Amino acid sequence: MQKKYYKNHVIQKKWGQIFLKDQNIIHSIISILNLKKYQNVIEIGPGLGALTKPISDIIDFLILIERDPNLVNRLLHTFTSKKVKIFNKDAMTIDFSKLLTNPNQKIRLIGNLPYNISTKLIIHLYKYINIIHDMHFMLQKEVAQRIVAQPNNKAYGRLSIFAQYYCKVQALLEVPKKSFIPIPKVESMIVQFIPYHTNNPYPTVNISLLSLLTKFAFHQRRKIIHNSLSSLLNSTEIIQCGINTESRAENLTIQQFCKLTTILHHKYNLN
């Protein structure tokens, strides 16, 4: 198979590498971020530094996480200042609490995430939600649409529920395929995640139970909720949550899923 290059770098298809090259998009992203010089900023997957350079020009200290050792070597030669620290690691293995350089400033996360790990990585990052100020990620458009989807939408599902349970999410910018090298098969979007540190609109629930409940509910999403949850809850319990038993999973709000989870929790006397 013929190797593909970008700026003399061998593009690693196994890691889903694509490189942002559109300067207009880069300027738009920097504007959206509205960075302050004192903030704790971590960039995941900096690639060859298309965003890194303008970010490092603004802030006092920047952490980069890059798994490709060849890219790390390039970055080390490009960003020689002590204000940029580079980790040659897989972001999925990182304890982000150890990267909190200023305990008075929560982390801001930025990244052009490989499409093949974006969902898993976001779920991993939610473990550190209490120390995160916000996150801005470039995602495959389909994944972005699933994250921000509302009830009564075919894109609405388990990912929508978990993303929105922890964060206010918003799609901010659509990025065309031609903005990248190599040109991907799909469009991309910038999605903003702002954690609910206070005033969470959803009640605190057992997350493992919410995961189980939504797994049953969306396993066969065309089933009515009475049938899909029959092994967990009866009709009376579903109606108690103000839910029509003829509804389908995609019709239920996150608030309603939380109510069902609470009933399930009490039903089995779980602590």
From Swiss-Prot:
UniProt GO cellular component terms: cytosol
Q: Where on the tree of life does the source sit, at the highest rank?
A: Bacteria
Q: Which residues form the signal peptide?
A: none
Subcellular location, record wording: Cytoplasm
Query: What InterPro entries does UniProt report for this protein, alphabetically?
Result: KsgA/Erm, rRNA_Ade_diMease-like_C, rRNA_Ade_Mease_Trfase_CS, rRNA_Ade_methylase_Trfase_N, rRNA_adenine_dimethylase, SAM-dependent_MTases_sf
Molecular function, one GO term:
RNA binding
UniProt-listed Enzyme Commission number(s): 2.1.1.182
What keywords is this UniProt entry annotated with? Cytoplasm, Methyltransferase, RNA-binding, rRNA processing, S-adenosyl-L-methionine, Transferase
Which spans of this chain does the record mark as coiled coil?
none
Q: Which PROSITE patterns match?
A: RRNA_A_DIMETH (PS01131), SAM_RNA_A_N6_MT (PS51689)
Broad class of enzyme this protein falls into:
transferase
What reaction does this catalyse?
adenosine(1518)/adenosine(1519) in 16S rRNA + 4 S-adenosyl-L-methionine = N(6)-dimethyladenosine(1518)/N(6)-dimethyladenosine(1519) in 16S rRNA + 4 S-adenosyl-L-homocysteine + 4 H(+)
Keyword DNA repair found: no
| UniProt-annotated binding residues for S-adenosyl-L-methionine | L20, G45, E66, D90, N112
Q: Which family does it belong to?
A: Belongs to the class I-like SAM-binding methyltransferase superfamily. rRNA adenine N(6)-methyltransferase family. RsmA subfamily.
**Function noted in UniProt:** Specifically dimethylates two adjacent adenosines (A1518 and A1519) in the loop of a conserved hairpin near the 3'-end of 16S rRNA in the 30S particle. May play a critical role in biogenesis of 30S subunits.
The protein in question is named Ribosomal RNA small subunit methyltransferase A
| The organism of origin for this protein | Blochmanniella floridana
Which taxonomic lineage is given here?
Bacteria, Pseudomonadati, Pseudomonadota, Gammaproteobacteria, Enterobacterales
Originating gene: rsmA
